[in-house]
Amino acid sequence: EWAKKLYIKAESKAEQINDFSGLADSIHDNLEDKEWATKLYKITETKCEVAEEFSDLAVKIHGRLSDKEWAIKLFKITESKLEGGENDPGETLADSFRYFGDNISEILGDKKWAEKVYKKSEENATYKNELEYLAGSVLDHLEDEKWANLIEQKAEELEDDE
């Protein structure tokens, strides 16, 4: 009961996306209160702005709440933001697409969607390392050796990253 009081106090002081998201995680994991966690994840969603935030929340929603439909909705927002050129902070657009493709494959198991996203990563790749990492993702997640080799060949044609 005292833990619940602490969480109520923490919720009253929460302001930022990570406050609400972390609190929801903790309430779900420690109090096993799915309803309260869901409420906090909904608040978190209203605070999401960039692709990475929507994608990270989708992973949590799927993992902790097992809500595939909500996760798909958030992943679609992620894709829309990336297609609009909004890459994740500190990442290139090609890497943002690759990370997103990895999530689609790992979380949803949707290989067709992941392939579509990886193609966008390849289209946006301008650096050798982007293509090398993408080749690894294509091999690991799609098990497409032929495509991975083609991406590797493309990477070899580029100069080393400066």
At which residue positions do the language-model features occur?
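Alpha-helix boundary/N-cap detector
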Residues: E1, N18, E35, E49-E52, ...
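Alpha-helical repeat scaffolds
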Residues: W2-E11, K34-E45, E69-K81, D110-E122, ...
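Structural register within alpha-helical repeat arrays
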Residues: A10, L23-I27, L57-I61, L93, ...
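Generic helix N-cap/helix-start motif at coil->alpha-helix transitions
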Residues: A14-G22, C48-D56, P89-R98, A125-E132, ...
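Structural motif corresponding to the intra-repeat A-B loop/turn of tetratricopeptide repeats
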Residues: N30-L31, R64-L65, I107-L108, H141-L142
